A protein has these predicted regions:
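Rossmann-fold dinucleotide-binding core
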Residues: 1-85
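NAD(P)-dependent Rossmann-like dehydrogenase/reductase catalytic/cofactor-binding core
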Residues: 36-39, 43, 47-51, 55, ...
Length: 220
């Protein structure tokens, strides 16, 4: 993938495989040490030995995958770059920030805005969705929350879908790879990166979050 930009071309006489756990490296390590699991995708780009898929699956088992599913290098790259820019990280930051800012603009306190936007989602609702599915959440919440969530979900889908379509196209046409390589190749990469992440850390929402997290009982 994107070999014209990366210059990475594998030798013709070796198996080329991948095993991609569906989580951050930190999560994979933590779950592995706890004897828990995370799912992984596996793919074969080049099978010289006739055992490439077997090796990829073995790698998935070795890192503690709950189950593995087969994909292709292309689909894995596209879905990975797309996902981390969308619902996994970029989209979360953007959605949290938008909701928080609207609450603050309408007179809600920083603590209330953060708790109603981030804390409740991350500490309570998202883990329940992970364990039981979204349909469970609709059935387990109040009738007020249920009706509102059912009504507004299509609105968010309609608003977000064009953004996700532009994002996927940017991944597919190589724009995201190009931008990443250019940014990561700068002599000032670390300084520039720190400036961007420091700006996020300095947003009121996440400054409030730092305080809220410190007040959790399990932090004491």
């Amino acid at each position: 993938m994107y070999k014209d930009q990366t210059g990475v071309v594998p030798p013709k006489d070796v198996d080329v495989i991948l095993c991609a756990p569906k989580g951050s490296g930190r999560t994979v390590r933590t779950l592995f040490k706890e004897g828990r699991v995370i799912n992984s995708s596996v793919a074969v780009f080049q099978d010289v030995t006739g055992k490439a898929l077997e090796k990829a699956v073995a790698m998935g088992i070795a890192v503690g995958s709950g189950y593995v599913y087969e994909t292709t290098f292309e689909k894995e790259v596209y879905s990975d770059l797309y996902g981390e820019r969308g619902c996994l990280m970029g989209g979360i930051q953007g959605m949290f920030k938008a909701q928080y800012d609207v609450l603050r603009a309408n007179g809600h306190s920083p603590s209330e805005a953060f708790n109603e936007t981030c804390e409740e989602a991350l500490e309570s609702l998202y883990p329940l969705v992970a364990q039981n599915g979204m349909d469970y959440m609709y059935k387990a919440c109040s009738t007020t929350a249920r009706r509102g969530a059912l009504d507004w979900a299509p609105e968010f889908e309609k608003a977000c879908k064009p953004v996700f379509e532009r994002l996927y196209q940017s991944v597919r046409d190589g724009s995201e790879t190009r931008r990443t390589l250019e940014f990561a190749s700068r002599p000032t990469y670390r300084k520039d990166f720190d400036k961007e992440t420091d700006a996020i850390a300095d947003q009121e929402m996440w400054r409030v979050g730092h305080v809220v997290r410190s007040l959790r009982p399990n932090r004491k």
